[in-house]
Amino acid sequence: MLETLSRQWIVSHRMEMWLLILVAYMFQRNVNSVHMPTKAVDPEAFMNISEIIQHQGYPCEEYEVATEDGYILSVNRIPRGLVQPKKTGSRPVVLLQHGLVGGASNWISNLPNNSLGFILADAGFDVWMGNSRGNAWSRKHKTLSIDQDEFWAFSYDEMARFDLPAVINFILQKTGQEKIYYVGYSQGTTMGFIAFSTMPELAQKIKMYFALAPIATVKHAKSPGTKFLLLPDMMIKGLFGKKEFLYQTRFLRQLVIYLCGQVILDQICSNIMLLLGGFNTNNMNMSRASVYAAHTLAGTSVQNILHWSQAVNSGELRAFDWGSETKNLEKCNQPTPVRYRVRDMTVPTAMWTGGQDWLSNPEDVKMLLSEVTNLIYHKNIPEWAHVDFIWGLDAPHRMYNEIIHLMQQEETNLSQGRCEAVL
């Protein structure tokens, strides 16, 4: 019994153990050499999402949304901006959905004039930000505990099938609106492609879909992370267990903040954060590095990582393969995983892609573009890597302003009975 518990503890704390060894080494260097200069740590590194919003002077609300299968999701809202805060009447609603191992903080990690969440609020929109099941802010269930394997038996399939409908319907009920705008980043776009192509009744509730660094397939992705995903399932489970993946415990967060606060480690810290998606370091506000690092790893399930492993190996956008015909029949009514058809999605879609993006690779994007039947706009930014879409210093004038223009044009068209926004 003790041996089993010891093994479980080692598996669940493996990452903290390695980082502790690294910190011990750094402390030894401090003792034996000149003290390493440190940077002032941004207080937002220690805040939750609502606290960050309030710290920047914006109003915020936080809700819990229950899904059909019992998960309880945290949803953050910026109901209005600091520009024209007394404007009365309903505002157009936008839902922002983060990427893999991310959270709602993806949209507010930069200063207000550089964060899409704040920029949209100041442009007159009612901004909602989702948190997918299993991340740092959505770790509740009506009947299951995070200590149970069953809690972690999900992937982006369930996020698309259950999380998105629950959040979208909650927002519509709360605001009294009939439709919303949907902005997805990375895995947030994957959720959108699946949900809007398989649930036409949900797709009818979307005015326009904005896909940033879109991912449907990862056949050509050249990120080091996708090479790791080529490992057999059993090896991935052996490394990370069967429950959560890359969740920042309080200890781990403090450790990451400390490491990224060392001037000598500045470049290393940024390189680690950019390793999976490609490098464009000159486009990041490195004074915010501690905020990025503290909020980047919000976690997901190991099963979600296994689903991405299947996607890398198959080169297709398919449902999770449960490993047997019997289990697949139980979960998706056929013996083999369902292949999702993006071409069945009719929502007006605008896409922004990066030429140096290692995850949303140009070759995969090329295949995706041929599948999107109602593409109203596509822009490729040659220098951009994966995180430029949420952290890029030039994101406001190269992309965010275009998103707002398309939304405002759509609002004008709707008020005048016209059909399509044009950039």
From Swiss-Prot:
Family membership: Belongs to the AB hydrolase superfamily. Lipase family.
EC number of this enzyme: 3.1.1.-
Subcellular location: Secreted
GO cellular component assignments: extracellular region
Record bears the keyword Lipid metabolism: yes
Gene from which this protein is expressed: LIPM
Tissue specificity as recorded in UniProt: Exclusively expressed in the epidermis within the granular keratinocytes.
UniProt KW keywords: Disulfide bond, Glycoprotein, Hydrolase, Lipid degradation, Lipid metabolism, Secreted, Signal
Disulfide bonds: 260-269
Major place of residence: secreted
A Pfam cross-reference name: Abhydrolase_1
Name recorded for this polypeptide: Lipase member M
